[in-house]
Amino acid sequence: MGEAAKDQTEEVIQAWYLDNKEEDQKLPHHKDPKEFVSLDKLAELGVLCWRLDADNYETDEELKRIRESRGYSYMDLCEVCPEKLPNYEEKVKMFFEEHLHIDEEIRYCLAGSGYFDVRDLNDIWIRVWVKKGGLIVFPAGIYHRFTVDSDNYMKAMRLFVGGPVWTAYNRPHDHLPARKAYMKKFLKVIGDRNIDASA
């Protein structure tokens, strides 16, 4: 990703280390002082980011190119807000449980905003704020969670390879092949110790 494209992407996708306070999950939870995380660091964890034209997603050639190159054949739209999502509070709590999937999770924010939290190489939470125009891909096997921010609204495009399978495996599920493959590819070393991804 070129510097200009990265700068534009950082306008709609920003990341920082969480303060780990247990109060309202919908707040930013910056550390004091703030510790921002670059898109390059997210990429080291397997998290991919793009900035796209959310107002013209139906005709966006870049979205089409990404979908074709990555095999995202299925698409649907969902709105996470009290008025549109049945059992809203229950669902928001469920999304915020730390979990992984055996396939990629792909979300494209068409309106509103929300937080995706992921773990770094030392198992410390990074908060990723995705706003309108941000497309983010989480690799299979990465532990993560989601919450809307204090605006309580996000309209997202969900993309899938094949059918819309969304099965969450709450932590711990380190025995799953997708987790082992993720650890082998991205978490080879934590601190000074090697991870045995075959265990």
UniProtKB/Swiss-Prot annotation:
CDD domains: cupin_ARD (cd02232). SUPFAM superfamilies: RmlC-like cupins. It is found in: Cytoplasm; Nucleus. Its EC number is 1.13.11.54, 1.13.11.53. Keywords: Amino-acid biosynthesis, Cytoplasm, Dioxygenase, Iron, Metal-binding, Methionine biosynthesis, Nickel, Nucleus, Oxidoreductase. One of its GO terms (cellular component) is nucleus. Ni(2+) binds at H99, H101, E105, H144. Pfam families: ARD (PF03079). Disulfide bonds: none annotated. GO terms for molecular function: acireductone dioxygenase (Ni2+-requiring) activity; acireductone dioxygenase [iron(II)-requiring] activity; heteropolysaccharide binding; iron ion binding; nickel cation binding. Pathway: Amino-acid biosynthesis; L-methionine biosynthesis via salvage pathway; L-methionine from S-methyl-5-thio-alpha-D-ribose 1-phosphate: step 5/6. Its cofactor is Fe(2+); Ni(2+). It catalyses: 1,2-dihydroxy-5-(methylsulfanyl)pent-1-en-3-one + O2 = 4-methylsulfanyl-2-oxobutanoate + formate + 2 H(+); 1,2-dihydroxy-5-(methylsulfanyl)pent-1-en-3-one + O2 = 3-(methylsulfanyl)propanoate + CO + formate + 2 H(+). It comes from the Eukaryota. Binds either 1 Fe or Ni cation per monomer. Iron-binding promotes an acireductone dioxygenase reaction producing 2-keto-4-methylthiobutyrate, while nickel-binding promotes an acireductone dioxygenase reaction producing 3-(methylsulfanyl)propanoate. Transmembrane segments: none annotated. GO terms for biological process: L-methionine salvage from methylthioadenosine. Fe(2+) binds at H99, H101, E105, H144. Catalyzes 2 different reactions between oxygen and the acireductone 1,2-dihydroxy-3-keto-5-methylthiopentene (DHK-MTPene) depending upon the metal bound in the active site. Fe-containing acireductone dioxygenase (Fe-ARD) produces formate and 2-keto-4-methylthiobutyrate (KMTB), the alpha-ketoacid precursor of methionine in the methionine recycle pathway. Ni-containing acireductone dioxygenase (Ni-ARD) produces methylthiopropionate, carbon monoxide and formate, and does not lie on the methionine recycle pathway. Belongs to the acireductone dioxygenase (ARD) family. This is Acireductone dioxygenase 1. The lineage of its organism: Eukaryota, Viridiplantae, Streptophyta, Embryophyta, Tracheophyta. The gene is ARD1.
